[in-house]
Amino acid sequence: MKHLLILLLACTFSFPSRGQSIIQLSPLQGERGIQAAIEKASMNGSSILLHDGDYILHKSIDIKNCKKGIIIKGKNPGKVQLRCDKPLKGKLRPVKDTQTKNRVHPNAQGIIMEIDLSEIGINVPFFPDLMKERKNFPQLIYNNELLPLSRYPNKGYLYMKRVLDNFGTNEQGGTFEYSDPEHGKWVNAVKNGLWFTGYWRIPWQAWTVRIKEIDPNKQTVTHSVGIETKEGKDVGIFGGIGSKYHRPYGSGKEEYYVENLLEEIDHPGEWCIDFTTQKLYLFPPEHFDENLLSIVSDTTPLINIINSNHIKIENISFKNHLGDGVIIKNATECLIAGCNFKNILGDALIIQGGKQNRIQSNNFEYIGRTCIEVSGGDRKNLIACKHLIENNYFTRFGEIQRSYAPAVKLGTFTTGIGIKEGNAVGITVRHNM
């Protein structure tokens, strides 16, 4: 029997560089200490050593216009963590409101807890009527693991029975017949906001759409807006609902599910946010310890590296953040090596422009969108940027953006209507898995 041996080799560099002094930091100094050290190091070329522990960030760390180079290194691999989650100890309360109790699933009666988001300075706007992904929507974390947003069904999908109206009108979206009787339980939820996520027209593009009406007598669902339609008409790319290969009635295999609904919290760890009350509801995980519960709500990047050269970051774990991780913009010969990215719910790492930047020997897991998005070079003049993406390990990405979120995306662009082009010239991607 043949065995496959995989070696992920950390990319190390001399620390400190010859002639550099070392600025040593502890977790108690937090992001202010890191920012102050960066400003000092950018002037005299010092190296920064982060001692083991959790560094809680309340705003972005900025490295701007630094031309002398800085090395930022964690003392021990996996022991230095930059994170952005808020602890929720002491914030959970029993549900007392009678109307809310009446909505709770039988499995969660007397168990479900609530958090008043206004008490922790979080305000969550309603979802838009139509979206491709949840944006600026907080995420609960327990023991450094993402807790699942309430969903029906808990696993798998619902399927449209038959499409009655593909495109809708100016006033509403398409209409379809459903099969699962659970829909009847959601009629009263429509008033305060009910959203379905589905692969309405093609099986590789998910849309989340607000529901205008559920008719339990006719067993129909009507969307509030059309999907890739205009004024109730197709825009020319087989918009609307129902498989574009089986018009007008659809294939009966179009997948969808409901999420963020109080009525469907029925398993430990599930949660939702009620936009009207601005309260979060949670079915506590098994063997629950509130010291391990936290929430992420800030969307600013963890680190911005802008117009800078020779910035090197090694042995740091970036974790528990709603926004992007590290952004490298118009920079030269920067290196991110031997780092871990976990529970970063935007893009974990972005390179925009610049030249000869390296992303090497990092781990990525539970990423909301893309692990690495990289662009650069000049396509018209065939000038290479020479960025390198090498020896990285990817698991579980596209956790929030369910489609068009690869491990590595080359060029900055959006798909579908209004394609935006970007440069991806002379980028090497090799030995990743």
List each language-model region with its residue ranges:
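Asp-box/WD-like beta-propeller blade repeats and closely related beta-sheet repeat scaffolds
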Residues: 376-378, 412, 416
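Short glycine/serine/proline-enriched coil/turn segments at secondary-structure junctions
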Residues: 203, 381, 399-400
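Right-handed parallel beta-helix
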Residues: 309-320, 332-346, 355-369, 383-398, ...
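Extracellular polysaccharide-degrading/modifying enzymes targeting complex plant/algal/animal polysaccharides
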Residues: 28-329, 335, 342, 350, ...
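Short, intrinsically disordered, charge-balanced linker/junction segments flanking boundaries
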Residues: 13-19, 413, 426-433
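C-terminal structured domain segments across diverse proteins
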Residues: 406-407, 432
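Short glycine/acidic-rich loop motifs that flank beta-strands on beta-rich extracellular proteins
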Residues: 59-60, 322-327, 345-352, 368-374, ...
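Bacterial Sec-dependent N-terminal signal peptides
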Residues: 1-21
